[in-house]
């Protein structure tokens, strides 16, 4: 590209999604929540812990682009990967506890929607437009998981703080249930 004076231009639509549209509809797999007793901690407590960290750093909004962190925070799981129960989604949380989950709405059944009544479910195709409407805020992103495209959108009108997602730290402190389940999974993995 260098010698040909080519230039990469970002586009708003994912061209692969346009080609894969019919196939994608036939393979929609629903999200689900794990029981609080299986997670060892209710998601509301995890959210409160995260909000305390954000308040200490004077962060007004966090854009969470790591699906595994969203899975942990909400006790939410998905079948979007063959090898891990990770839901393909993004999350925005603000200092006032407004939470927006961006995903394919077909992946949310009525029962799950009731369980997630503390947040708003937004079609993932509106994520870019939603981010463009955030102005004059201190926004935390983790640049190791946030795409350059979304970083650029947020940087246009906001003070973007690039730090490691604080959820990684919260996840590293295991509760008794998580420790017990980790030991179980190692045993099952060893037997296999």
Where do the protein language model's features map onto the residues?
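Active-site neighborhoods and metal-handling regions in enzymes and metal-associated proteins
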Residues: 1-192
């Amino acid at each position: 590209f260098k010698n040909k004076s080519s230039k990469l231009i970002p586009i708003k639509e994912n061209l692969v999604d346009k080609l894969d549209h019919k196939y994608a509809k036939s393979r929609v797999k629903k999200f689900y929540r794990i029981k609080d007793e299986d997670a060892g901690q209710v998601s509301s407590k995890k959210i409160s812990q995260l909000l305390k960290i954000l308040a200490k750093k004077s962060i007004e909004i966090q854009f969470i682009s790591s699906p595994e962190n969203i899975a942990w925070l909400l006790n939410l799981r998905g079948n979007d990967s063959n090898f891990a129960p990770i839901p393909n989604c993004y999350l925005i949380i603000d200092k006032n506890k407004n939470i927006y989950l961006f995903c394919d709405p077909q992946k949310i059944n009525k029962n799950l929607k009731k369980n997630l009544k503390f947040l708003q479910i937004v079609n993932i195709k509106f994520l870019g437009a939603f981010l463009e409407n955030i102005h004059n805020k201190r926004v935390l992103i983790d640049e190791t998981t946030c795409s350059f495209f979304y970083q650029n959108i947020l940087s246009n009108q906001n003070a973007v703080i690039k730090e490691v997602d604080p959820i990684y730290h919260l996840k590293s402190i295991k509760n008794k249930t998580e420790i017990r389940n980790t030991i179980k999974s190692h045993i099952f993995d060893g037997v296999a």
